[in-house]
UniProtKB/Swiss-Prot annotation:
It comes from Anaeromyxobacter sp. (strain K). It is found in: Cytoplasm. Its EC number is 6.1.1.16. GO terms for molecular function: ATP binding; cysteine-tRNA ligase activity; zinc ion binding. Monomer. Pfam families: CysS_C (PF23493), DALR_2 (PF09190), tRNA-synt_1e (PF01406). Zn(2+) binds at residues 29, 210, 235, 239. Belongs to the class-I aminoacyl-tRNA synthetase family. Its main location: cytoplasm. It is an enzyme of class 6 (ligase). This is Cysteine--tRNA ligase.
Length: 481
């Protein structure tokens, strides 16, 4: 087994070799919790959830840490607007984030540190940087990182200092020695949360927070650091500078994290989703209209490093495909019940190999679709199933569930999943499920009375509204086209 990942630091695909055999330490930058999470968060955290699931399925003992940033300028601004305590506001939105992640089927991290609970570690790390000459306190209560002291600054983002200096500036009131320097500690201001430090009361800067929490919960160096590609600069670039300067004499980026992975953006009409452009969707906005597993399935249809466009139409198509998969699983499990054990289908190992190759989820979904087409044809074949055919269907169902477990899909009873997906689709179309059920009952009565003209009229009227009836051994079910 060889797992290949695209490493942002080297801009190459590399074999993922943990520092300690059999174990892997992963840090993912979590959300700044000042509002409800958006589709970009959904994409990001579904990606890293699949990474964790696959690494564990491949036998690695993964320690997964993802933080909450609950001390930040945006949180303070939002809390002041609402007259609310910043930490309380952040805690409320952290709870909402958990609800959203649960709805998407994401596993919880092993550790979820919060900045507000790690102030002593942050202060100690800043003091270490000052002591080693990589940071300075100009005397106004702030502490800054001296960027030019770190020789590999910008290596991750492929930017040199000359390029960076053109866009750098010093804000009024700042006491930077160099426009490139960035804040590690910010002096207290009225109405802001503040903690004691050797430089006076204040609060940490954004970048130092993740460095401190990574070191506390994973040590240094770690195997893998991940997040959205918007974090490459400045956040991850600054994390490297801080963490390496505090812990290593070699001053190489690998002394903090051996591998770096980044996911692409969610776009609306080829533009990055943002509030300023008015094309912003929260996870809750979408889950009010679509099933959470359908959204997850949709997100996995694009390679994690690529940007992709979101639209209701494309998501609805993903929802339809997921329903079709569940329908096939239902048939395979029902028809293969009680069959003798059979060998694992070849598509399962092909799916594993695709995930080994930089977590190629769209390729996995393509492999699964091929296998489902074959299973569907076998299940729909007329006549009694032979013991061999039953065994093949049962093996397919087990394989589908195994691949689904790594992707975080196909984990519900088919009837439950199909009903949930159908009900969301019906609500979007303004279809009353209760009314449909009453029509089905009326049609059943007409058929019992051999009034087939009435029965057909009811079926056709429902079909005209996008409702498809399916007659089976257990009665009539329905779905929305």
């Amino acid at each position: 087994m060889s797992i290949q990942v695209h490493d942002t630091l080297t801009a190459q695909k590399r074999e993922l070799v943990p520092l300690e055999p059999g174990k892997l330490r992963l840090y993912v930058c979590g959300p700044t919790v000042y509002d409800y999470s958006h589709l970009g968060h959904a994409r990001c955290y579904v990606v890293w959830d699949v990474v964790v699931r696959h690494l564990r399925a491949r036998g690695l003992e993964v320690r997964f840490v993802r933080n909450f940033t609950d001390v930040d300028d945006k949180i303070i601004q939002r809390a002041n607007e609402r007259g609310e305590d910043p930490i309380a506001l952040a805690s409320r939105f952290a709870d909402a984030f958990h609800e959203d992640m649960d709805a998407l089927g994401n596993l919880r991290p092993d550790v979820e540190p919060r900045v507000s609970g790690h102030i002593p570690e942050i202060v100690a790390l800043i003091a270490r940087l000052v002591e080693r000459g990589f940071a300075y306190a100009p005397g106004n209560g702030d502490v800054y990182y001296a960027v030019r002291k770190f020789p590999e600054y910008g290596r991750l983002s492929k930017r040199n200092l000359d390029d960076l200096i053109a866009g750098a500036r010093v804000e009024p009131g700042e006491a930077k020695r160099d426009p490139l320097d960035f804040a590690l500690w910010k002096a207290a201001k009225p109405g802001e949360p503040a903690w004691e430090s050797p430089w006076g009361k204040g609060r940490p800067g954004w970048h130092i927070e993740c460095s401190a929490m990574t070191q506390k919960h994973l040590g240094a160096p770690i195997d893998l650091h991940a997040g959205g590609k918007d974090l490459v600069f400045p956040h991850h670039t600054n994390e490297i500078a801080q963490s390496v300067a505090a812990t290593s004499d070699g001053l190489h980026a690998e002394d903090f994290a051996r591998y770096w992975m980044h996911n692409g953006f969610v776009q609306i009409d080829d533009e990055k989703m943002s509030k300023s452009l008015g094309n912003f969707f929260t996870i809750r906005d979408v889950l009010a209209r679509f099933d959470g597993e359908a959204l997850r399935f949709f997100l996995l249809g694009t390679h994690y490093r690529r940007d992709f466009n979101f639209s209701d139409q494309v998501l609805a198509e993903a929802e339809r495909r997921l329903s079709a998969l569940y329908e096939t699983v239902e048939k395979a499990e029902r028809l293969g019940a009680g069959a003798a054990p059979a060998a694992e289908p070849a598509f399962v190992e092909r799916a594993r190999a695709a995930l080994d190759d930089d977590f190629n989820t769209p390729q996995v979904l393509g492999i699964v679709a091929e296998a489902f087409t074959e299973a569907n044809a076998l299940a729909d074949r007329k006549g009694k199933k032979s013991p061999e055919e039953k065994a093949r269907l049962a093996a397919f169902a087990r394989g589908a569930r195994a691949v689904g477990a790594v992707l975080g899909i196909l984990d519900r009873p088919p009837a439950q999943a199909l009903s949930a997906i159908r009900d969301r689709a019906a609500a979007r179309r303004g279809i009353d499920g209760g009314e449909v059920e009453r029509s089905i009952a009326e049609r059943a009565a007409a058929r019992a009375a051999k009034d087939f003209a009435r029965s057909d009229a009811i079926r056709d009227a429902l079909l005209a509204r996008g409702v498809v009836l399916m007659d089976g051994p257990q009665g009539t079910t329905w779905k929305v086209e």
